[in-house]
């Protein structure tokens, strides 16, 4: 394996069931630096302070382009993410954001907090491989995002919502219970709909 640029966006407590702790996650990710043709071509997103994720990501891209001596003008820059990794689907005059490939409660919170809770609906599935504290992490997520209209599914969320009674949180068991008609109405009303979860859900 060899690469021209290595970008580390962040280190989060993902896949704890495999790596056990965040220190092991950090070591594993940083070991990928060995693939670099030039050790200087490393963009460390951990040192980029910006509360807005999109602005932080733009800065990461700018630094990577600079390392590759590519024009930094991002006005004409286009990027199509892989399925489930942030695809934006234009529908009924609004947007569906598809982040169903993978998710972590912390990143869901950070992303959602940048949105207007009165104009955004969240559809969340269980997030896997979080280790022993997975229920607490899901519970914390719902507590932090209590102002949003939220639809949840999955075994973890089914247990967690029992501890957080809220008129804003709705559970659906399966595809048959999926609130399609309601979400279409929200899109037509100009609200964004975020889908976030793991492939397992």
Regions of interest found by a model, annotated:
Residues 18, 30, 47-56, 60-201:
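ATP-dependent carboxylate-amine ligase
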Residues 1-49, 128-129, 133:
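Flexible active-site lid/hinge loop adjacent to a nucleotide/diphosphate
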């Amino acid at each position: 394996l060899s690469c021209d640029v290595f970008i580390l966006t962040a280190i989060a407590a993902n896949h704890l069931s495999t790596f056990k702790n965040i220190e092991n996650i950090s070591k594993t990710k940083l070991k990928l630096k060995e693939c670099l043709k030039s050790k200087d071509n490393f963009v460390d997103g951990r040192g980029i302070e910006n509360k807005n994720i999109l602005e932080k990501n733009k800065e990461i891209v700018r630094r990577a382009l600079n390392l590759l001596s590519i024009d930094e003008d991002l006005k004409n820059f286009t990027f199509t993410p892989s399925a489930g990794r942030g695809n934006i689907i234009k529908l009924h005059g609004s947007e569906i954001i598809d982040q169903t490939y993978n998710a972590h409660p912390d990143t869901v919170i950070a992303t959602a907090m940048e949105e207007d809770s009165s104009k955004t609906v969240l559809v969340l599935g269980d997030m896997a491989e979080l280790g022993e504290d997975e229920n607490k992490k899901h519970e914390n997520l719902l507590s932090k995002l209590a102002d949003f209209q939220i639809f949840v599914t999955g075994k973890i969320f089914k247990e967690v919502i029992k501890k957080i009674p809220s008129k804003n949180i709705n559970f659906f068991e399966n595809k048959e219970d999926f609130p399609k008609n309601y979400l279409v109405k929200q899109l037509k009303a100009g609200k964004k709909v975020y889908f976030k979860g793991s492939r397992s859900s």
